[in-house]
UniProtKB/Swiss-Prot annotation:
Homohexamer. It comes from Mannheimia succiniciproducens (strain KCTC 0769BP / MBEL55E). The keyword RNA-binding applies. GO terms for biological process: regulation of DNA-templated transcription; regulation of RNA stability; regulation of translation, ncRNA-mediated. InterPro entries: Hfq, LSM_dom_sf, Sm. This is RNA-binding protein Hfq. Disulfide bonds: none annotated. Residues 9-68 form the Sm domain.
Amino acid sequence: MAKGQSLQDPYLNALRRERIPVSIYLVNGIKLQGQIESFDQFVILLKNTVNQMVYKHAISTVVPARSVSHHNNPQQQQQHSQQTESAAPAAEPQAE
């Protein structure tokens, strides 16, 4: 598997799995919006009111509506969760 695929596939899969709305900008400037239904090495199937097959070579940018966690394996996911929890500030007691 190429290095580019090792980041691309987990990222697209997380967007698909969590059904996160995305904006896909094409190299010609057109903006497409929807949810990623499926993808393979060459295309992304984008679902909105209709399904569109978008060729990856025509895509400039994929912008999710919210942030997404996209780790390649469960160990990375667990490490990320632990780092996020330890970085969260402790709640301060409120004065009565």
